[in-house]
A protein has these predicted regions:
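A short beta-strand motif characteristic of beta-propeller blades
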Residues: 20-24, 101-105, 151-154, 158-159, ...
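Conserved beta-propeller blade repeats
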Residues: 1-2, 27-45, 74-83, 87-89, ...
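Serine-hydrolase catalytic core recognition
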Residues: 115-116, 123, 129, 261-458
Length: 458
C-alpha cells in the first residue's frame, strides 16, 4: 500500500509484526504509484515512480455546487503543447528481502506515456510499454525480476508517427512469442515476434489492405480471427470483413465475402457467428454462419425499407472520386432531402470531422444519420468524406496529417465535391458550406481561412 507517497508492506494479521517501508524517497512531486502489481509467486512487486512536471492550471467554475450557495472554483492541471510532461519509470521491489532492485531507466525520460502491462506467469519478469513523446518510437520492454535488467521485445520506430491507438499485442506461451500489430511495411498488419530475441519470426498478414481489429486468438489451433478492410479492389476500402489466418501466414480466409460492412456476433464456443452486414445504400441483412466456412447456414432477417421509400426517403449514395494526386480513390457519401428534385439547384454542405485517429464516414445503413440527413431536410445536399490524413488506409495516406493538421484532406475533399458536381448538375459548387463539431469545428474554420475560394460559409 501507499502512505506518504511511499510503498509499505504489512501482514494482513495485525498481530504479526509492524509495517515495513519498501521505499523512503517518495515525495509529493516524485511519488510511487498506488497500482502495486504482485508477482504470481508473491516475492516481488512492480509499480511506477512518477515525477510530476510543473504544469499549467486552468480554472473550472462549478455554478451550482451542492455544498454552498456561491459558485465554487476548481483548478485542473492542463499541459499545453510543448510543455514538460510527467515522467514515469518502472520500479521493482524484492518483498522477501525488503529492498528495491535498481533498474537502468535512462532513455525513457522523454515520454508521452509509460505503463505496466503485467507479470509473466512464472514470475521471471514483468513487461511495460513506452511511447516516446512525438510517437516516433514505441517499446515493449521486459524487466528481469532477478537482476533488474531491461530488454526490448518490440522497438517500433517511424520517421513520421506510430498510430499507437491501433496497437495490438498478444503474448503467447507466457511471452515466448508475441503477436504484434505494425505499419512497418506501409500497411497495418500482424507480425509474430520471438519473445526471447525480439526478432520477427514471420509477417502473418500482408497486402494493400489493413487489419482493423483482432477479435480473438485461438492459441491451440494457432489461428487469429480479425476484422480487415480494403481486401477487395472494387469495394469501398473501409468496409470491414471478418477474416482468419494461421500464425505462419497460411490459410487466410475472408469469412464474410459480401460487398458490405460486416459486424459479427460470436456464439459462446465461437463455432458459429451471426453476421450483420449493410452499407449506407444497402439495408441490413443478418445471416448465420459456421466458423471457417463461407456459406450461409440460414438467413435470419432482411430489413424491409419499402415504407421508408414510400415516404419519399432518399437512399444515401456512396461516391468515389480521385484525390489531389489524381490517383488515390477518395470515398464519401451523398445525402439528399426527402423532397429532392433533380431539376433544382441545391447548395452543398460538407459535414466534416478530419481527426487523424480514425476514419469517420459511416459505412453502415442508417436511415436517419442525424448529423447529415437532418441538415439535408433543410434543403441542402450534404456530403461526408474521408480525405487524406485520416486513418484506416495506407500509412502513406495517413501520413499526410503529420505536422500538417491544417491540411485536413481539403485538397481531396474539394476534388471529390467537384467530381460529384460534374456528375450531378444540381449540386451548386458556388454555394458550398461546411460544419463540424470538436475537431470538425477546427476543420470548418480552417476551410474558411485557407480555402475560402471554395467554402463560403461555416
Amino acid at each position: 500500500y501507499i502512505r506518504d507517497n511511499n510503498v509499505y508492506i504489512a501482514s494482513s494479521d495485525k498481530n504479526q509484526g509492524e509495517e515495513v517501508p519498501l521505499s523512503i524517497d517518495g515525495t509529493f512531486d516524485c511519488f510511487y504509484d498506488a497500482n502495486l502489481i504482485w508477482s504470481p509467486d508473491s516475492k516481488k512487486i512492480a509499480t511506477l515512480k512518477t515525477r510530476q512536471a510543473n504544469c499549467r492550471r486552468i480554472p473550472l467554475l462549478e455554478s451550482a455546487p451542492k455544498t454552498q450557495l456561491q459558485p465554487l472554483l476548481h483548478w485542473r492541471n492542463y499541459a499545453k503543447p510543448g510543455d514538460v510532461l510527467p515522467v514515469s519509470v518502472p520500479v521493482l521491489f524484492d518483498v522477501e528481502h525488503c529492498k528495491q532492485i535498481p533498474l537502468d531507466t535512462r532513455g525513457y525520460e522523454n515520454q508521452f506515456s509509460l505503463s505496466l502491462t503485467g507479470w509473466r506467469e512464472d514470475s521471471r519478469g514483468f513487461t511495460f510499454e513506452f511511447n516516446r513523446r512525438g510517437h516516433q518510437q514505441y517499446i515493449v520492454g521486459e524487466v528481469n525480476a532477478q537482476n533488474g535488467m531491461i530488454r526490448h521485445l518490440v522497438d517500433e520506430k517511424s520517421d513520421t508517427f506510430i498510430s499507437y491507438i491501433n496497437n495490438y499485442r498478444y503474448d503467447l506461451n507466457d511471452g515466448m512469442e508475441i503477436l504484434w500489430m505494425s505499419e512497418r511495411d506501409g500497411w497495418r498488419h500482424l507480425y509474430r515476434i520471438d519473445g526471447k530475441t525480439g526478432e520477427v519470426k514471420n509477417q502473418i498478414t500482408r497486402g494493400e489492405w489493413v487489419v482493423r481489429k483482432v477479435i480473438f486468438v485461438d492459441a491451440g489451433q494457432q489461428r487469429i480471427y480479425f476484422m480487415a478492410s480494403g481486401l477487395n479492389k472494387k469495394e469501398d476500402p473501409y468496409n470491414q470483413h471478418y477474416c482468419c489466418v494461421n500464425f505462419d501466414g497460411t490459410g487466410f480466409q475472408d469469412l464474410t465475402p459480401e460487398n458490405a460492412n460486416h459486424k459479427v456476433i460470436l456464439s459462446k464456443d465461437r463455432s458459429y457467428f451471426v453476421d450483420v452486414y449493410s452499407r449506407p445504400d444497402l439495408p441490413p441483412v443478418s445471416v448465420l454462419r459456421k466458423l471457417g466456412e463461407k456459406k450461409v447456414i440460414a438467413t435470419l432477417e432482411k430489413c424491409d425499407i419499402s415504407d421508408l421509400k414510400a415516404q419519399g426517403w432518399q437512399m444515401p449514395e456512396v461516391f468515389c472520386a480521385k484525390g489531389r494526386d489524381g490517383k488515390t480513390d477518395i470515398w464519401g457519401t451523398i445525402y439528399r432531402p426527402f423532397n429532392f428534385d433533380p431539376s433544382k439547384s441545391y447548395p452543398v454542405v460538407e459535414n466534416i470531422y478530419a481527426g487523424p485517429h480514425d476514419s469517420h464516414v459511416s459505412k453502415d445503413f442508417n436511415p436517419i444519420e442525424w448529423s447529415s440527413s437532418s441538415l439535408a431536410e433543410l434543403g441542402y445536399i450534404v456530403v461526408r468524406i474521408d480525405g487524406m490524413g485520416t486513418n484506416n488506409r495506407s500509412k502513406k495516406f495517413h501520413d499526410v496529417c503529420w505536422k500538417n493538421l491544417k491540411d485536413a484532406g481539403f485538397p481531396d475533399r474539394i476534388k471529390w465535391i467537384q467530381a460529384a458536381a460534374r456528375k450531378y448538375k444540381y449540386m451548386d459548387t458556388s454555394r458550398v458550406g461546411i460544419y463540424g463539431w470538436s475537431a470538425g469545428g477546427q476543420n470548418a474554420m480552417a476551410a474558411l481561412l485557407f480555402h475560402n475560394d471554395f467554402y463560403k460559409a461555416a
